[in-house]
Swiss-Prot record:
Family: Belongs to the GHMP kinase family. IspE subfamily.
Taxonomic source organism: Synechococcus sp. (strain CC9605)
Keyword list, A-Z: ATP-binding, Isoprene biosynthesis, Kinase, Nucleotide-binding, Transferase
Domain of life where this protein originates: Bacteria
Entries under NCBIfam families matching the protein: ispE (TIGR00154)
Name of protein: 4-diphosphocytidyl-2-C-methyl-D-erythritol kinase
InterPro entries in the cross-refs: GHMP_kinase_C_dom, GHMP_kinase_C_sf, GHMP_kinase_N_dom, IspE, Ribosomal_Su5_D2-typ_SF, Ribsml_uS5_D2-typ_fold_subgr
GO molecular function, one term: 4-(cytidine 5'-diphospho)-2-C-methyl-D-erythritol kinase activity
Gene: ispE
Chemical reaction(s) catalysed: 4-CDP-2-C-methyl-D-erythritol + ATP = 4-CDP-2-C-methyl-D-erythritol 2-phosphate + ADP + H(+)
């Protein structure tokens, strides 16, 4: 049996640059892995079947699940149709939260089954396969802190910070946001401000490359968090506004933002102890607002084989 850890991510920067010729949005992002993680276990089977179980009954375990789609793609590319596996998912990352939980689980399937079946694919091979399944999935394979361009699949690693930064995640467990809706709404509201060509896109990429990410504490300025979808989602989602307001009320928070298309929001803290203290401070208000919270350290890797 092989066990794989599949971490969540937050977006430290999500900039919608414009529209691509294929209809997708051109993005410039900084994504960061955190230690809130799902756990997947993989065992060989002799019947050439791919099966998935999960400890969260609300999650679909049918063929539409990214875990099984990733497993099928990897097996197809291997040429060994007789390969089979039983997969069990312990779900810890909230579903539909803007934290790439599904993408990370799919990436974990590629990494875990590559090892279980002894296929020998490189990380680069797995990232290319991941890109066929989802825009966030290559990042989930690589993890750590990455600049992410294109649809999010083009990665450039950012050196890890020497500082023990942490994030306090906050989410209403009853609320989810449709990612396609968020980008459609962004287009409706902001298309007049979109950049028009590759030269303009590259200028913004270069500007992002010049930012010294995750090392803002040398000055009194807050970290340069940005999420263009926050301006779209927050006005129409009370749970996002409540989460941002609560996080912003904590004096120790360095900056706050929504992650991905939401509705999860996070505050950035100088260390895990400060983060946990803030969670304790907010406990009554969080409960009153129906919000759940997680104190998380940053991770320097993506999906990882644990055993």
């Amino acid at each position: 049996m092989i066990t794989v850890s599949a971490p969540a991510k937050v977006n430290l920067h999500l900039e919608v640059l414009g529209l691509r010729s294929d209809g997708f949005h051109e993005l410039a992002m900084v994504m960061q892995s955190i230690d809130l993680a799902d756990r997947l276990s993989f065992q060989n089977t002799a019947d050439a079947q791919l099966s998935l179980t999960c400890d969260d009954a609300s999650l679909s375990v049918g063929d539409d699940n990214l875990i099984l789609r990733a497993a099928q793609l990897l097996r197809d590319r291997s040429g060994f149709s007789e390969l089979g596996a039983s997969i069990h998912l312990e779900k810890r990352i909230p579903i539909g939260a803007g934290l790439a939980g599904g993408s990370s689980d799919g990436a974990a399937a590629l990494v875990g089954l590559n090892a279980l079946w002894g296929l020998g694919h490189s990380t680069a091979d797995l990232e290319r396969m991941a890109a066929e399944l989802g825009s966030d999935m290559p990042f989930c394979v690589a993890g750590g802190c990455q600049l992410c361009f294109g649809r999010g699949e083009q990665l450039e690693a950012v050196p890890p910070t020497p500082q023990p930064l942490a994030v306090l995640l906050v989410k209403d467990p009853t609320v989810s946001v449709s990612t396609p809706w968020a980008y459609k709404r962004c287009r409706e509201l902001k298309q007049s401000h979109y950049l028009a060509d590759e030269a303009a896109f590259e200028q913004r990429r270069q500007a992002l490359r010049s930012v010294d990410w995750l090392q803002p504490l040398r000055s009194d300025l807050p970290p340069p968090l940005r999420n263009d979808l926050q301006d779209v989602v927050a006005p129409e989602t009370a749970a996002v506004r409540s989460a941002l307001d609560l996080l912003d009320s904590v004096p120790q928070s360095l900056a706050v933002a929504m992650s991905g298309s939401g509705p999860s929001c996070f505050g950035l803290f100088s260390d895990l102890a400060s983060c946990r203290h803030a969670q304790d401070q907010l406990a009554t208000q969080l409960e009153r607002a129906g919000l759940k919270a997680w104190s998380c350290a940053l991770r320097s890797d993506g999906v990882r084989i644990e055993a």
